[in-house]
Amino acid sequence: MTGTGPHGDPAEDPAGPDDTAAETDGPAEPTEPVDASEAEMTDTTETTAQTGTTAEADASEEFEGPRRRARRERAERRAARDRAMAIEQARREAKRRAVAGALDPTKSVPRNTIRGLKVLMWAALVSVLAVALGLLLYFTPIMSARNVEVSGLAEIPQEEVLTAAAVAPGTPLLQVDTDAVAERVATIRRVATARVQREYPSTLKISIVERVPVVVKDYPDGPHLFDRDGVDFATGPAPLALPYLDADNPGPNDPATRAALDVMMALPPDVAAQVGRIAAPSVASITLTLIDGRVVVWGTDDRTQEKALKLAALLTQPGTTYDVSSPDLPTVK
């Protein structure tokens, strides 16, 4: 729209160029879609323009028309929508990968876990087989005591040992209580120790250590034999060259008896064979009488080994009484 100026020249409408274009162009044509890269370039351009001087920014905002503003807003909305779609797409992809990993049979169970399960299964199978085999051997005569072997016998009859053991032939070896059998065999007076072992497939072995007589003592019912521990284990004829014991209360708990037996065990074999009688009225007064009548004054039971060595040397000298009660000063009379 034009008018006439004061001098007759056409006057310019105060409206800006954009307004004139809006009036002459008519309705705005549809704008082609702008992709995200164009939006980012627009944002970059606008950011660069905004970093200019304050005056230029104010001028740009003052002369921005409706069409440019609408275009810029549409570009911003498209960029925001594209970013939202990209985020949603990333979320869907992550979820899909997680589900695929969970359903993947090669990743569902770690290899170490599979190996551990196999070991556990084999261990359980072996345990079951072991239990089944144990039950089979325990309740069936596959491995039974068909033979009973006794070793270490000298004076004890084997029948006496088998009777005391009381193991029925054909008893499964696993059902034989070896400790109980050993305790029954040890009740025999002449048995010092007894040991029972299973020897598969069908043998029960009994090992015995018999008591050995060291001294003998006369009783009204006959001679009683005593071993090195002072145990009265047999009644009967005394072996030759076995010394007689003179003690008030012989037994394993009598100190005088134990002292006399310690002296006999300390003597050299050739000297012990010469002893005919050992008297121990007390621990402090021990006397030996040799077969030929010589007397040995032993005294107390201390320093027994020294006294035994001194006596072996003194007996080579003539005399009737040998005093080793003081091993530092032995005498011969």
From Swiss-Prot:
Region (Disordered): 1-99
Cellular localisation: Cell membrane
Topology feature Extracellular, residues: 140-333
Function: Essential cell division protein.
Gene3D superfamilies: membrane protein fhac
This protein's UniProt keywords: Cell cycle, Cell division, Cell membrane, Membrane, Transmembrane, Transmembrane helix
Electron transport is among the record's keywords: no
Protein name, entry field: Cell division protein FtsQ
Record membrane topology: Single-pass type II membrane protein
Transmembrane region(s): 119-139
Family that this chain belongs to: Belongs to the FtsQ/DivIB family. FtsQ subfamily.
Main location: membrane
Basic and acidic residues: bias regions: 73-92
The UniProt record lists the keyword Ion transport: no
Acidic residues bias spans: 11-22
